[in-house]
Swiss-Prot record:
Organism name: Drosophila melanogaster (Fruit fly)
Disulfide bonds: C29-C82, C84-C89, C93-C181, C94-C107
Topology class, membrane: Multi-pass membrane protein
Signal peptide per UniProt: 1-19
Keyword Lipoprotein: no
One example of a Gene Ontology biological process annotation: response to starvation
Pfam families: Methuselah_N
Entry protein name: Probable G-protein coupled receptor Mth-like 9
Designated gene of the protein: mthl9
Length: 513
């Protein structure tokens, strides 16, 4: 049977080889500065004439990909030239004589042809002038981005400045030429204006809400588990209970931040806040898996009857936290490096969390999680076989009843298997989506799986915890039993409504109104 670790390694190497192959091709300029010149006029010297601009051969190259939302996708090989380096470019959302339909999100033919020949241009000295578009810019019609932001109800949507180099200012932000496109829009009845539509990375809809609602319910369940484990002294003091508490605390904080990012438009967050929230969520979630791995190792050492001193245990926890902090800064360095975009996590760019359109999430997120879960599974398997190596008359193991340790171990192992299955599903779904180039920024099935794990945690981590069950039997069930005995003794009435018990301190009384 092929190890999942080997499969992940093969996938990672194939991805890396493909990305290096793409990055190694020498392109004369950035994709955002190019235009498809296949339909241009080829000159005798090998140059191309396109929209009145002569593109020399050294500024042309064949491209086997296209860029949408800043991410490369496979495409038929075509010729592109660095036209925008020779003359500023602006993008139109739709071909000539078509307009963008904000209701159906496509290009449609208007009832009356809307010619867009002029645009307001803002100069460096802040003066504004109406200029003929094709005199100042090369017009290109490309997708650029899948989702376009349209908000005709607010006045600031109609307020923007187009500069001489093709960049656009709106909402106190500069947008490059591949982050917006122009289209005529109806501002007032029968009054159309040429308006730029910015690329919208934030998505809403039923997927987001299903994910958010399921995650919030899961967080509430985990908070209940955490509070009950923390309130029971024996559970709180045991090594197993401590690690589960640390795990739940990290997971609650991490998923709470992810839900916040799912519901919050990144455009309404500063770059620093967006980036820091994403990295904090990453740190907490990775730390939760480290605690699961430590708990698995702790069970293995117990069944091997290898005692670990408290100082060593505290040191190992501190080193684990430091290792996750180091991993967090390693991912931050990768984000700020000059690596190809496919190797970057993408935090703080289009999204505050990982960009699922690149391979970075597999390298920095799914990869470490898979390694930690494989380590946990291996430790649990070794611990399981170590149980049968114990002497038959063993009652206690390192000062704890063997029955308690075994019960907790079986419940924890079942939970680990569930976590492993959920995350293998996550990785497989991501790889299939990445290969097909069909992405969902929010996968609502992830929220359903998170909720399922919370329910499993309630049953296995809380319901099967013998310390909690003992506390519940003493403090809750016994109290209810005593109360029911008292009630049964006090409130025994005969058919007439009088008390049956003659020794009851409560005597029937007659009250008149």
């Amino acid at each position: 049977m092929v190890s999942p670790l080997i499969i992940l390694l093969i996938i990672w190497l194939s991805v890396g080889a493909k990305s290096v192959e793409i990055a190694s091709i020498n392109h004369p300029c950035a994709y955002a500065h190019t235009v498809n010149i296949t339909d241009g006029l080829r000159m005798k010297d090998g140059s191309y004439s396109y929209a009145g601009v002569v593109v020399p051969p050294h500024l042309m190259a064949e491209y086997s990909f296209k860029v949408i939302d800043g991410v490369e996708y496979r495409a038929k090989k075509h010729l592109r030239g660095c036209v925008c380096l020779l003359k500023p470019c602006i993008s139109f959302c739709c071909p000539e004589n078509l307009v963008f339909d904000a209701k159906h999100w496509n290009c449609t033919m208007p009832h009356q042809v809307r010619e867009s020949t002029h645009v307001e241009l803002t100069y460096a000295n802040r003066t504004v002038d109406q200029v003929r578009i094709r005199d100042r810019f090369v017009v290109r019609t490309e997708l650029g981005c899948r989702n376009k932001f349209v908000d005709k109800k607010h006045d600031n949507f109609w307020q923007w400045d187009l500069f001489e180099n093709g960049t656009l200012r709106r909402d106190n932000r500069l947008w490059s030429t591949d982050e917006y496109c122009f289209s005529p829009l109806e501002h007032n009845p029968e009054q159309w204006e040429l308006t730029p539509l910015n690329c919208e990375r934030f998505q809403t809809g039923y997927r987001v809400w299903i994910y958010a609602i399921c995650s919030i319910i899961a967080i509430i369940i985990n908070i209940f588990i955490l509070s009950l484990l923390g309130s029971v002294r024996d559970a709180r003091k045991s090594h197993y209970g401590q690690l589960i508490i640390y795990y739940l605390l990290s997971m609650i904080v991490g998923y709470s931040l992810l839900v916040y990012l799912a519901l919050k438009n990144p455009m309404k967050l500063s770059h620093v806040a967006c980036r820091n929230i994403g990295f904090l969520a990453y740190f907490c979630i990775m730390l939760s898996f480290v605690f699961l791995a430590i708990c698995s190792l702790d069970f293995l050492l117990k069944f091997k009857q290898k005692a670990v001193r408290s100082s060593v245990r505290r040191l190992s926890l501190a080193l684990a936290v430091l290792a996750v902090i180091g991993l967090r800064f390693l991912v931050s360095l990768a984000q700020d490096s000059k690596l190809p975009k496919h190797f970057k996590p993408g935090m703080g760019e289009d999204y505050c969390w990982f960009d699922v359109r690149t391979w970075g999430i597999l390298i920095y997120y799914y990869g470490p999680i898979a390694l930690l879960l494989i380590f946990s599974i291996v430790c649990c398997l070794k611990a399981y076989f170590s149980i049968y190596e114990l002497p038959p008359d063993t009652q206690y193991i390192l000062g704890t009843q063997l029955k308690i340790v075994k019960t907790h171990f079986y419940a924890f192992s079942a939970y680990i298997v569930g976590v492993f299955a959920v995350w293998i599903r996550e990785i497989v779904v991501y790889i299939m989506a990445r290969v097909r180039e069909h992405f969902f920024i929010i996968d609502f099935w992830s929220g359903i799986c998170i909720l399922g794990l919370a329910i499993a945690g309630f049953i296995l981590l809380l319901g099967k915890n013998l310390h909690v069950k003992s506390w519940w039997a003493i403090n809750v069930e016994s109290s209810q039993t005593d109360l029911s005995i008292i009630n049964a003794r006090v409130y025994k009435f005969d058919e007439k409504g009088d008390l049956k018990s003659s020794d009851s301190p409560y005597k029937p009384t007659v009250t008149s109104l």
